UniProtKB/Swiss-Prot annotation:
Organism from which the protein derives: Azorhizobium caulinodans (strain ATCC 43989 / DSM 5975 / JCM 20966 / LMG 6465 / NBRC 14845 / NCIMB 13405 / ORS 571)
Subunit structure, interactors included: The RNAP catalytic core consists of 2 alpha, 1 beta, 1 beta' and 1 omega subunit. When a sigma factor is associated with the core the holoenzyme is formed, which can initiate transcription.
Range of residues in the leader sequence: none
Record's protein name: DNA-directed RNA polymerase subunit beta'
Entry GO MF terms: DNA binding; DNA-directed RNA polymerase activity; magnesium ion binding; zinc ion binding
Name of the coding gene: rpoC
Residues annotated for Zn(2+) 1 binding in this entry: C71, C73, C86, C89
Assigned protein family: Belongs to the RNA polymerase beta' chain family.
Length: 1393
């Protein structure tokens, strides 16, 4: 009883627990049952008394009292009358909070259609009635009648009649012989008279009997909606409203402003219109007004209700007094400002503050400096409690006074309160989980938050005015999670790639680099030291310097933990760093006995973390930081003008290039090359020149000068130190300072031909300065635009992947994907070892030479395995992948592998989907913000040759080469590859060489590292001849299919193939044929004529009658001129891949292996058929004539070969080559974009996203399931249905996976809450309501929305415990029920209640 007295003012009823939420269409009875009364008047409140009008929109009788426990007229006040209804004003005496919960309703005089079911495409009413939207609107808005009961007349059921037709029919057949209705009543009648079961059966018969392609699809849609109504228990006529619910008044408030005016929610205006029109309609009906007036009023009522539900969906937008569209109920849910995204997924938080950040170098890694003022405010409740407990104050009021006066005891108590109470720091934008971390606060004076320098890279923070927010975790659980999971000391590794993120940068790196320098002939060279004490002494006495070569004794630990000492040749500086190393046998002094660049420091921290654990690494990093800062300060490194060394050979190189470009101009003037080729060559020449000058500059800057007398090395160039150590600046920036700025891009992305020859030291000319302004501006504009794009990409990724949670240890799958090293133009860009680290092997990994097992099946591949894999020369390993994981909901731990942020196997309940989305999205923003860092200087990325990285012997696969007139070996095959094998026959590298390249090596040659093995012209694609002969032209008609363009500048003609379609009646197939001595067309070696069909825009390189040799070029197809490869191409490219859009000029992929045949042309397309080798049907492709087809008649293609160049569409790869190939393609393409920017993301993140893009299966055969052929079904739903079929001995459904873009996949998740809060809210909710969908609340988003713990991390454990507890309760109750008498059970149940 005592408890109840205490809680009178805020009675806490336990929130009802639920496991799922169902949404369906509300019936009129349901709406009435929600309502507390009908609203009859449009009035809101009385303007004099400010009391709500009775029966109005704010009526207290319907919605409840305005003040707590007080009726409107004031007769009953206070608690003792709780629950009494005042006889005078009719208001119940209760809490005013009920005004947020109680609903009312409006009874409509005429039914109206619900606009969502009418207009939200596809129109549900339209589909169900099989009528077009246009016809429906004609009926609803009172233009046409519809026949609902034809009687014996020749009229048809559902036939539309205009007013005149209707009157005519009445005259003709008599008034009572048929019934025709108009407006929503008519539609309601049609919907009510539907027999869904019969309709469904009829449609199924129709689908079975239909012959055309389109009809079944249309019928299937209709069948789906009919079955949805049957299954969900919704009745079709409920889509027409007879009652309109009115939401509680406190959710659409009317607030008095100062000056006697009111601010009101738009909903009140919209409701008022509905009530006014409804009342007027009632009155008109009572008055028996003419039909036309009543009809007009009904139409207006329909429009008013439409505007209330979704303003602007149909017809004009209804605007308020200030011409602003009114916010309807639908607008309250939609978009960034709607209920879902503004209030449910993102909330404002109390116990938080924000301030500017400053650097706190004396803090430990787990600390942050919190201003006292902020702490006092944030921890107020804790302080009050502690003051009370210590007896400093008796009441909260007294405590408040003490705190306000800032008495000395308050500060002592604040210290106690804060001790070991972590706070969370957050820097916006929070792009990945490292954007919020927990720290222990240290009280400081001042008003700025102090941040530890090493966590800056995780927050992406700098101290130029950034602000950060502080949040206080209140409950014990929250504090525990903050400490155990979110403490900055737990986030040493980056979740995207597993590399350390607590890495020194800038000054610290510079200090450590300076410390580890070794110089010749310094004082005291060759001295020997026993320990650090001696070294410090010697430095203090100036007997040695930090960079002297000395011999020092380092005491290490061996594998058994015994100490040993060893003498190293080193420097005092390196000994200082070595002193900080934790003692461990796997962390020897060699780790620091080298020049410490940023990369080396990162490797060192990684080594320490892997072997010595977290605690040691944190202490090590902190000490490293102090050492670095101190030595950077002691070194006093800065740079002046003389440090920017302009290379001596610069002008010589520039002159050489100028001569070269003059030569190209001359070739162009002589007509040897085209304008486009000249442009490409000039740009290329300047690009090479810039690089060579940069190399010269780097040589000169990095050269170590010696004192001629003593031979002592001088101080290294400061700029070089900064760049080489990785502290600041890149070679690209140094090139601009002291080399040559190089080529610039126009805003369009084209490169300007004339480069900037000056550098910043020399200063730019006016012309050069003007050319360079493009890049700078484009950079700034790009940044602004791309930040938004990147944020949107992250949002879509999170939405598609949020359900991927680790839900079981091992799914037991034996499938996986094959991993190989990624080689790009001969360079190994991602080694096999780096790709398989932290993944699980599907099969034993065996060393090829000895047959030893390196990694047993089902074991995770760790660092120590990697060394052996690298040595053994294994080419391919099959590993488990989330793509082939068989877990129903979520993913299993074994398929996922290592948790990159911890370096251990992934924990149960880890939200790997969100981590993947963040890892891919975060650099997106980074990259976009970094576009202009090179100041728009164009970076060319065109290769025209292949060099090998390995020594060995050359093997040529698919060797098909010819010697051309110049005696070069020319590649004639489409799939020729050069393989370099080492002495024991292991393949070291495979280079695909493109058609038309000139080979520099041949079968059996030996090659050295860096030797060029092939080269080609990067600007044109050649068409080569395979036989010798004399040239003849076919269908090359001047002015129709070929134009002789005379270049104005040179006066020389060149022949270009043009599009003959533009000339009427000309069906020309331009080609070059080769004729033998007898004048007949030569035959190719593999049969077929030597006829080369020419694509549009090909430039012909030969003349008729000319004699040429095999391997010579007959025509060239120009490539697009070089554009700068910037991440600008990158971000849209990544989005395009994840959205699975078909590229503009998609490649055409062979679906089967077979022989190519060309058939008759079809209009403006060429017909290409592949006759399969194995037998079966031939496949036909129609290819536009402008596309260059590589193949000749009779060529043999493999399944999956490209028939036409271009970017392949991912859907085709999936259909032809399967899931593994698709995943490999997407992973490689996306990685390429990030790699270009030097961003490292682990493959598994991309795989997680791709898994979610493959959620749906398209059924080839629905078997005996409830699905239809060709329908797209969720993978899990299909598996469940097939299990049911197997149990019943029926035929299961079969299908093939389909690829959906991330937006589409997010909208088709099983959870309608998640989809509705993502995009297209109206459509998602409409569809869910019609289907009577149940949201099982499995994902993260749904649970955040309904305010429960998310089913990941600690929430997953809580869920598990709840499930176990429930099942245990059921068990106990069941056993109790068996043992005792039934009556007893009833009694005990009552007692429990």
């Amino acid at each position: 009883m005592n408890q109840e007295v205490m809680n009178l003012f805020n009675p806490t009823t336990p929130a009802p627990t639920f496991d799922q939420i169902k949404i369906s269409i509300a019936s009129p009875e349901k709406i009435s049952s929600w309502s507390y009364g009908e609203i009859k008047k449009p009035e809101t409140i009385n303007y004099r008394t400010f009391k709500p009008e009775r029966d109005g929109l704010f009526c207290a009788r319907i919605f409840g009292p305005i003040k707590d426990y007080e009726c409107l007229c004031g007769k009953y006040k206070r608690m003792k009358y709780k629950g009494i209804i005042c006889e005078k004003c009719g208001v119940e005496v209760t809490l005013s909070r009920v005004r947020r919960e109680r609903m009312g309703h409006i009874e409509l005089a005429a039914p109206v259609a619900h606009i969502w079911f009418l207009k939200s495409l596809p129109s549900r009413i339209g589909l169900l009635l099989d009528m077009t939207l246009k016809d429906l609107e004609r009926i609803l808005y009172f233009e046409y009648f519809v026949v609902t009961e034809p009687g014996l007349t020749p009229l048809k059921y559902r036939q539309l009649l205009s007013e005149d037709d209707y009157l005519r029919a009445q005259d003709e057949y008599g008034e009572d012989s048929f019934t025709a209705m108009i407006g929503a009543e008519a539609i309601r009648e049609l919907l009510r008279s539907m027999d869904l079961e019969k309709l469904a059966a009829d449609i199924r018969v129709e689908i079975a009997n239909s012959t055309t392609e389109l009809k079944p699809k249309k019928l299937a849609k209709r069948l789906k909606i009919v079955e949805a109504f049957q299954a969900s228990g919704n009745k079709p006529e409920w889509m027409i409203l007879t009652h309109v619910p009115v939401i509680p008044p406190d959710l659409r408030p009317l607030v008095p402003l100062d000056g006697g005016r009111f601010a009101t929610s738009d909903l009140n205006d919209l409701y008022r219109r509905v009530i006014n029109r409804n009342n007027r309609l009632k009155r008109l009906i009572e008055l028996r007004a003419p039909d036309i007036i009543i009809r007009n009023e009904k139409r207006m009522l329909q429009e008013a209700v439409d505007a209330l539900f979704d303003n602007g969906r149909r017809g004009r937008v209804i605007t308020g007094a200030n011409k602003r569209p009114l916010k309807s109920l639908a607008d309250m849910l939609k978009g960034k400002q709607g209920r879902f995204r503004q209030n449910l997924l993102g909330k404002r938080v109390d116990y938080s503050g924000r301030s500017v950040i400053v650097v706190g170098p004396e803090l430990k890694l787990h600390q942050c400096g919190l201003p006292k003022k902020m702490a006092l405010e944030l921890f107020k409740p804790f302080i009050y409690a502690r003051l009370d407990a210590k007896g400093h104050s008796a009441t909260v009021k007294q405590a408040k006074k003490l705190v306000e006066k800032e008495r000395p005891e308050v500060w002592d108590i604040l210290d106690e309160v804060i001790r070991e109470h972590p706070v969370m720091l957050n820097r916006a934008p929070t792009l990945h989980r490292l954007g919020i971390q927990a720290f222990e606060p240290v009280l400081i004076e001042g008003k700025a938050i102090q941040l530890h320098p090493l966590v800056c890279s995780a927050f992406n923070a700098d101290f130029d005015g950034d602000q950060m927010a502080v949040h206080v975790p209140l409950s014990l659980e929250a504090q525990l999670e903050a400490r155990v999971l979110m403490m900055s000391t737990n986030n040493i590794l980056h979740p995207a790639n597993g590399a350390p993120i607590i890495v020194p940068s800038q000054d610290i790196v510079l200090g450590l680099y300076y410390l580890s320098l070794m110089r010749e002939k310094e004082p005291g060279e060759g001295m020997m030291f026993a320990d650090m004490g001696e070294i410090d002494h010697a430095i203090a006495a100036k007997a040695i310097t930090l960079h002297t070569k000395i011999r020092g004794r380092y005491i290490g630990v061996d594998a058994d933990g015994k100490r040993y000492s060893k003498i190293y040749e080193t420097t005092p500086g390196r000994m200082k760093i070595g002193e900080l190393l934790p003692k461990h046998h796997k962390v020897p002094f060699d780790v620091v006995n080298k020049l410490m660049t940023k990369k080396e420091i990162s490797n060192m921290i990684d080594t320490v973390y892997r072997h010595c654990g977290q605690k040691e690494s944190v202490i090590f990093c902190d000490r490293l930081m102090s050492l670095g800062f101190y030595n950077a300060f002691r070194a006093g490194i800065s740079f002046g003008k003389d440090d920017m060394v302009v290379p001596a050979k610069k002008w010589q190189l520039v002159e050489e290039t100028r001569t070269l470009t003059k030569e190209y101009e001359q070739q162009y003037n002589d007509g040897l090359i085209t304008q486009g080729e000249k442009y490409n060559k000039v740009v290329d020449a300047w690009g090479k020149c810039t690089d060579r000058i940069a190399d010269e500059m780097m040589k000169e800057i990095s050269a170590v000068k010696k004192d001629p007398e003593t031979g002592r090395e001088k101080q290294i160039n400061s700029i070089y130190m900064m760049s080489h150590s990785g502290a600041r600046g890149s070679p690209a920036q140094m090139k601009q300072l002291a080399g040559m700025r190089g080529l610039m891009a126009k805003p369009s992305g084209e490169i300007i031909e004339s480069p900037i020859i000056s550098n910043f030291k020399e200063g730019l000319t006016v012309m050069e300065y003007f050319n360079s302004t493009h890049g700078a501006r484009k950079g700034l504009a790009d940044t602004a635009l791309k930040t938004a794009n990147s944020g949107y990409l992250t949002r879509r990724l999170v939405d598609v992947a949020q359900d991927s949670i680790i839900n079981e240890r091992d799914c037991g799958s034996n499938n996986g994907i094959h991993m190989r090293a990624i080689i790009d133009s001969g360079q190994v860009v991602a080694s096999l070892a780096s790709r398989v680290l932290g993944r699980t092997a599907v099969e034993d990994v065996v060393e090829p030479a000895t047959g030893d097992i390196i990694v047993p099946k089902g074991t995770m591949i760790e660092e120590h395995h990697i060394e052996r894999i690298n040595k053994s020369g294994i080419q391919e390993i099959k590993i488990r992948s989330v793509l082939t994981c068989e877990t129903r909901n979520g993913v299993c731990g074994t398929c996922y592998g290592r948790d990159l942020a911890r370096g251990t196997p992934v924990n149960m309940g880890e939200a790997v989907g969100v981590i993947a989305a963040q890892s891919i999205g975060e650099p997106g923003t980074q990259l976009t913000m970094r576009t202009f860092h090179i100041g728009g200087a164009a970076q060319l990325a065109d290769s025209s040759f292949v060099e090998t990285n390995f020594e060995g012997t050359v093997r040529v696969r698919n060797r098909n080469v010819a010697r051309n007139s110049e005696g070069d070996l020319v590649v004639m095959a489409r799939n020729l590859a050069i393989v370099v094998v080492d002495h024991d026959g292991t393949e070291r590298a495979v280079h695909r060489i493109q058609y038309g390249s000139r080979l520099k090596v041949d079968e059996g040659d030996t090659v050295k590292r860096g030797q060029r093995i092939a080269e080609w012209d990067p600007y044109t694609r050649p068409i080569l001849t395979e036989v010798d002969g004399t040239v003849g032209f076919e269908d090359l008609v001047e002015g129709q299919s070929m134009s002789e363009a005379v270049d104005e500048a040179t006066g020389i003609a060149k022949r270009v193939v043009t599009d003959s379609r533009s000339v009427r009646g000309a069906d020309l197939r331009p080609a070059i044929v080769l004729k033998g001595k007898d004048g007949k067309v030569s035959k190719l070696p593999r049969g077929g004529d030597a006829r080369y069909t020419l694509p549009v825009e090909a430039i012909i390189s030969v003349d008729p009658g000319q004699t040429i040799k095999a391997g010579d070029v007959v025509a060239r197809v120009p490539m697009e001129s070089a554009k700068t490869r910037d991440i600008t191409g990158g971000l849209p490219r990544v989005a395009e891949l994840f959205e699975a859009r078909r590229p503009k000029d998609a490649a055409i992929i062979a679906e089967i292996s077979g022989t190519v045949r060309f058939g008759r042309d079809y209009k403006n397309k060429r017909r290409l058929t592949i006759e399969p080798t194995e037998g079966g049907d031939a496949v036909e492709y129609l290819i536009p004539k402008g596309k260059h087809i590589h193949l000749q008649d009779g060529d043999v293609v493999e399944k999956g070969d490209f028939l036409v160049d271009g970017n392949p569409a991912p859907h085709d790869i999936l259909a032809i080559k399967g899931v593994e190939e698709l995943a490999a393609f997407l992973v490689n393409e996306i990685q390429e974009v990030y790699r270009l920017q030097g961003v490292n993301i682990n493959d598994k993140h991309i795989e997680v996203i791709v898994r979610n893009m493959l959620q749906k299966v398209e059924l080839d055969d629905a078997g005996d399931t409830e699905f239809l052929d060709g329908e797209q079904v969720d993978r899990i739903e299909l598996a469940e249905a097939n299990e049911r079929m197997k149990e019943q001995g029926l035929k299961p459904a079969t299908g093939h996976p389909v690829l959906l873009g991330i937006t589409k996949a997010s909208l088709q998740t099983r959870s309608f809450f998640s989809a509705a809060s993502f995009q297209e809210t109206t459509r998602v909710l409409t569809e869910a309501a019609v289907n009577g969908k149940v949201d099982p609340l499995d994902g993260l988003k749904e649970n955040v929305i309904v305010g429960r713990l998310i089913p990941a991390g600690t929430g997953a454990q809580m869920n598990k415990l709840r499930v176990t507890a429930n099942s245990r309760d059921d068990l106990i109750l069941a056993t109790r029920g068996e043992s005792e008498e039934p009556s007893m059970v009833e009694g005990s149940a009552d007692a429990a209640e």
